[in-house]
Amino acid sequence: MKRQSVRIKLFPLKKEEIPAYLDDKGVFVNDYFKTYLDHSAYQVVEEQQECLVEIVSLADMGFDREATAPQIEERAVEMGYQLPPAPLGVYLRLALLEQEVSQDAILSQGKSPDGAICLLSPQLEKEFTFPRSVYLRKVDQDLWLRAARFDDEYAFPLTTLFAFVTKNANEFVVGSEP
């Protein structure tokens, strides 16, 4: 997948509405996502807004080998990106219904899956036992929004895709093109 910019529309959804809304759209979630969603620090979108998201690989970010989450987060900030807020994964999943199908159909294998788009949001909880971030994946024809656990030592492969915010709602100019 090439570097891609996506305009995302965010709208109010209560925490308890999110699972049913995703289900209605044909999106599957894992148990880690349910745990992630239930955390008290997970903030829902309160008002309708838009943001621009850029999807980039580690290579697009200038890495020449695998990198850890702290290295990726630091580079993202240096490049002018913002870490995506926790709820952005829901809206990005709804916007990217045409994601490439993963070549590896095995779920939960303890590594970053091919074709996944990861969102390194600020951690809701520092404990390794709690999911750290979410990612979007398409397996067979099923769309997934999954949460994952990993520590600061986990190295993401060079081909891993990440989504970062480039403009938030307050900076967005109506009618401009991404």
Per-range role (PLM):
Residues M1-P178:
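A binding-site-centric feature that preferentially detects glycan-recognition modules on secreted/surface proteins
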